[in-house]
Amino acid sequence: MNYFELFKFSPAFDIDTAVLAERYRELQRAVHPDKFANDTEQQRLLSVQRTAQVNDGYQTLKDPIRRAEHMLSLRGIDLSHETTTVKDTAFLMQQMEWREALEDIRDSADPQECIDELYDSFAAYRTKLTKLLTAQLSSDSEEDALLAAVQVRKLKFMAKLHDELTRIEDALLD
């Protein structure tokens, strides 16, 4: 299913999430199972299925990584169950630096400063990746689509690192 069509968007990485939320509410009202409570069993089942599609579409389009994955899947590149690793040497070196920094937080004289620096570093790198991804996804080139898949893989890794940093910060606050 093309969630961009469902929510009446042109396929694009940058979408207005406020408009997305508004269209989500409109679709929810139109297909909500309560609206079909007195209809046939088949109509009620279709309503439940349609509601699930609307919910999944909304969750997909509101999350930038899932949105990018969806755009790529519409172009025949499925990353949803993929285990391919990034082979970019510079990125691998950066990963190692971040991992070392994560390990060093607890022994640091000022753990919060280290955490803040890592959050800033992650944000800067995500911004860089997002700019590349936006340009690559707006292109019709197969090569750019494959490069966009690489950026998505990197962003997925960044999301995991961010979650790990958040867990470390939470543990230090306990």
From Swiss-Prot:
Q: Which SMART domains match?
A: DnaJ
GO MF annotations, alphabetized: ATPase activator activity; protein-folding chaperone binding
Which InterPro entries does the record associate with it?
DnaJ_domain, HscB, HscB_C_sf, HscB_oligo_C, J_dom_sf
| Pfam families assigned to the protein according to its UniProt record, in alphabetical order | HSCB_C
Using the record's annotation, list all stretches that form the J domain: 2-74
* Any one Gene Ontology cellular component term annotated for this protein: iron-sulfur cluster transfer complex
Q: Which domain of life is it from?
A: Bacteria
Q: Which keywords appear in this protein's UniProt record, sorted alphabetically?
A: Chaperone
**An annotated GO BP:** protein folding
Its biological purpose is as follows:
Co-chaperone involved in the maturation of iron-sulfur cluster-containing proteins. Seems to help targeting proteins to be folded toward HscA.
HAMAP family attached here?
Answer: HscB
Similarity comment text for this entry: Belongs to the HscB family.
Oligomeric form and interacting partners:
Interacts with HscA and stimulates its ATPase activity.
Report the protein name in the record: Co-chaperone protein HscB homolog
* Source organism of the structure: Shewanella sp. (strain MR-7)
List the gene name: hscB
